C-alpha cells in the first residue's frame, strides 16, 4: 500500500490545516507526521492529530509539539493509525510523553504492544457492579472518606499542603500492600514538580512500580489535552490484560479542560460559558467513563483538581465533580497545626460512607468521630473568647477527645521518612476502627494528647504515652 501524503495549507498556532488528494482524507483522530526542523533534526518528528474534516480534501489538525518553523506546502505523512503509546511492564519506571516517546534519556521502551489513546469505555456488561472499599492504609482516608475500588477521587488543596506527598504514599502503599501498579499523568503542571516527583519516587523506591506520562505547562495545548488519555491507555492495559487493580493519578485534571479550551477556539467552535469549549462535558465524559472496574480488574483514579479563583461553580471543576465518588480535601489550617496528612475530616466526603457498603460498625464510628470534631469546631469561638474554663464539664470532655482524635488522624508516611525521622506506618482498617472507637468511648481519657500524634495504631499511642510518662 502506497503511503498517503498531504501538504500544509495553513498554520494557526497549535492548529494546522493539511490538504490531501480527493478521496484520501485520513479519518478523525489519525496521527499525521511532519518534519519540524525547529524541534530537532529527525525526520517526521512532529505529530498532528486530525480533529476536523474541512470539505472534500482538507483536514484540520492539532499539533502535539511546537509548530514554530513549519511552512506552507510542507509534506505531511498520514501514519494510517491513531496516536499509539507503548503499554506493558516495560513502561514501569519510565517517563513518556504524550506520543509515547521516552523523555528520561534511558533508551527506547521496547514494549511488545502498543495501544491507541482513544479507546471505547468498557461495555456495560463488562463492568463490575460490586461496590467495595479500597483500603489505602491511611487512617483519615479509610475511616472518614473511603475510596471505592474503581472509583474516582478528587484531591483538592492549595499549594504546599501535601498533595504530592499524599499521592506518593498512595503509590507506595498500593505497590507494597496490593502489589499493584500505578500510572501518573502529569497534565499541564510545573516541570520542576514533575522532576521532583521522579527524583523522590526514585529515592523512596516506588519508581519501578509506576509509569509516568508527562505533558507539562510548557507543552502546546494539543499535548496537554491528550496526555491524560495516553496515561489512561497504559493503565487500561494493566487492567484488561493483566487483571490488575491499577491506580491512576492525574495532576491536574483542570489543565486537561484548560488545554481543550485553548484549542477549541482555534478549531472554530463557538465558546460557551466563561469561554470554555462547548464540548466540555463530552470530553470529560470520554476520559472519565474509561476509568472504571471491570470483571477483570479495576482502575481507581485520584485526580488533583485546581479550582480557579476558589470558585467551585466554575464550569471546569463543576464538570469534574459530576464524576467523583469521593473527595479528599487538604486544609491549610490543619497543615499549620503540623498534622499530616492535612486531610480535612469534616470537608472530605465519600459516596461509599454507607452502612450497606462499609458495615454498620465502621459507619457509626466514622459518624461519631465527625460529630465530636464538629462539636469542637462549634466550641472554638467560645474557647477563643472566654477560655477553656468557662466550658461545662461535658464540653471539656468533648474538646479533650476531639484534640486526641485530631492528633490520631495524623500518621507518619513511608515516603516522608527522610523528613520526619520516624518509620512510615500502614494501618489496617480494623485497627483504625478499633482505635477511634476506643477514643470516642472515652477509654483513653487519661492519656495525654501528644501520645496520639504521628503514630499508627492505638497500641503505639499507648506505648508512646508510657515513654512520655517515664
From Swiss-Prot:
Q: Span of the secretion signal?
A: none
> What Enzyme Commission number(s) appear in the record?
7.1.2.2
**UniProt keyword list:** ATP synthesis, ATP-binding, Cell inner membrane, Cell membrane, CF(1), Hydrogen ion transport, Ion transport, Membrane, Nucleotide-binding, Translocase, Transport
| Enzyme class label | translocase
Q: Which domain of life is it from?
A: Bacteria
Which residues bind ATP per the record? 157-164
In which compartments does the protein localize?
Cell inner membrane
| A Gene Ontology cellular-component term | proton-transporting ATP synthase complex
> Which InterPro entries does this UniProt record tie to the protein?
AAA+_ATPase (IPR003593), ATP-synt_VA_C (IPR055190), ATP_synth_F1_bsu (IPR005722), ATPase_a/bsu_AS (IPR020003), ATPase_alpha/beta_chains (IPR050053), ATPase_F1/V1/A1_a/bsu_N (IPR004100), ATPase_F1/V1/A1_a/bsu_N_sf (IPR036121), ATPase_F1/V1/A1_a/bsu_nucl-bd (IPR000194)
**Oxidoreductase listed as a keyword:** no
Record's Pfam families? Answer: ATP-synt_ab, ATP-synt_ab_N, ATP-synt_VA_C
- What catalytic activity does the UniProt entry give for this protein? ATP + H2O + 4 H(+)(in) = ADP + phosphate + 5 H(+)(out)
* Statement: the UniProt record of this protein carries the keyword Lipid metabolism: no
Tell me the membrane topology, using the record's own terms. Answer: Peripheral membrane protein
User: Which Gene Ontology terms cover its molecular function?
Assistant: ATP binding; ATP hydrolysis activity; proton-transporting ATP synthase activity, rotational mechanism
Function in brief? Produces ATP from ADP in the presence of a proton gradient across the membrane. The catalytic sites are hosted primarily by the beta subunits.
Q: Which family does it belong to?
A: Belongs to the ATPase alpha/beta chains family.
Task: Name it.
Answer: ATP synthase subunit beta
The record lists the organism as: Geobacter sulfurreducens (strain ATCC 51573 / DSM 12127 / PCA)
Amino acid at each position: 500500500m502506497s503511503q498517503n501524503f498531504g501538504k500544509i495549507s495553513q498554520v494557526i498556532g497549535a492548529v494546522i490545516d493539511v490538504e490531501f488528494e480527493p478521496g484520501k482524507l485520513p479519518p478523525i483522530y489519525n496521527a499525521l507526521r511532519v518534519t519540524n526542523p525547529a524541534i530537532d533534526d529527525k525526520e517526521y518528528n512532529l505529530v498532528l492529530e486530525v480533529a476536523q474534516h474541512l470539505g472534500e480534501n482538507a483536514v484540520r489538525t492539532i499539533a502535539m509539539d511546537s509548530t514554530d518553523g513549519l511552512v506552507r506546502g510542507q509534506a505531511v505523512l498520514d501514519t494510517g493509525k491513531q496516536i499509539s503509546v507503548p503499554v506493558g511492564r516495560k513502561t514501569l519506571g519510565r517517563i513518556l510523553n504524550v506520543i509515547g516517546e521516552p523523555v528520561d534519556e534511558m533508551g527506547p521502551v521496547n514494549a511488545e504492544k502498543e495501544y491507541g489513546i482513544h479507546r471505547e469505555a468498557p461495555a456495560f456488561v463488562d463492568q463490575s457492579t460490586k461496590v467495595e472499599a479500597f483500603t489505602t492504609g491511611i487512617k483519615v482516608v479509610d475511616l472518614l472518606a473511603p475510596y471505592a475500588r474503581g472509583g474516582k477521587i478528587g484531591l483538592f488543596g492549595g499549594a504546599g499542603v501535601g498533595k504530592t506527598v499524599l499521592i506518593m504514599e498512595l503509590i507506595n502503599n498500593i505497590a507494597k500492600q496490593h502489589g499493584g501498579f500505578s500510572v501518573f499523568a502529569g497534565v499541564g503542571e510545573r516541570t520542576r514538580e514533575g522532576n521532583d516527583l521522579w527524583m523522590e519516587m526514585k529515592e523512596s523506591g516506588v519508581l519501578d512500580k509506576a509509569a509516568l506520562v508527562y505533558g507539562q505547562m510548557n507543552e502546546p495545548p494539543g499535548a496537554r489535552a491528550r496526555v491524560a488519555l495516553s496515561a489512561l491507555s497504559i493503565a487500561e492495559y494493566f487492567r484488561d490484560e493483566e487483571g490488575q487493580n491499577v491506580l491512576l493519578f492525574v495532576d491536574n485534571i483542570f489543565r486537561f479542560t484548560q488545554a481543550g479550551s485553548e484549542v477549541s477556539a482555534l478549531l472554530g467552535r463557538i465558546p460557551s460559558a466563561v469561554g470554555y469549549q462547548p464540548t466540555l462535558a463530552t470530553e470529560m465524559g470520554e476520559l472519565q467513563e474509561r476509568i472504571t472496574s471491570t470483571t477483570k480488574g479495576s482502575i481507581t483514579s485520584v485526580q488533583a483538581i485546581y479550582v480557579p479563583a476558589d470558585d467551585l461553580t466554575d464550569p471546569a471543576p463543576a464538570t469534574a465533580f459530576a464524576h467523583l465518588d469521593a473527595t479528599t480535601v487538604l486544609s491549610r489550617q490543619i497543615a499549620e497545626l503540623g498534622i499530616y496528612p492535612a486531610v480535612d475530616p469534616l470537608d472530605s466526603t465519600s459516596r461509599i460512607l454507607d452502612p450497606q457498603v462499609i458495615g454498620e460498625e465502621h459507619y457509626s464510628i466514622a459518624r461519631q468521630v465527625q460529630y465530636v470534631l464538629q462539636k469542637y469546631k462549634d466550641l472554638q469561638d467560645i474557647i477563643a473568647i472566654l477560655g477553656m474554663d468557662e466550658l461545662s464539664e461535658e464540653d471539656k470532655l468533648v474538646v479533650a477527645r476531639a484534640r486526641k482524635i485530631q492528633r490520631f488522624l495524623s500518621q507518619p508516611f513511608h515516603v516522608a521518612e527522610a523528613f520526619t525521622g520516624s518509620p512510615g506506618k500502614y494501618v489496617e482498617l480494623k485497627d483504625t476502627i478499633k482505635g477511634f472507637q476506643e477514643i470516642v468511648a472515652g477509654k483513653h481519657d487519661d492519656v495525654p494528647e501528644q501520645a496520639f500524634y504521628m503514630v499508627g495504631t492505638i497500641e503505639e499511642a499507648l506505648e508512646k504515652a508510657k515513654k512520655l510518662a517515664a
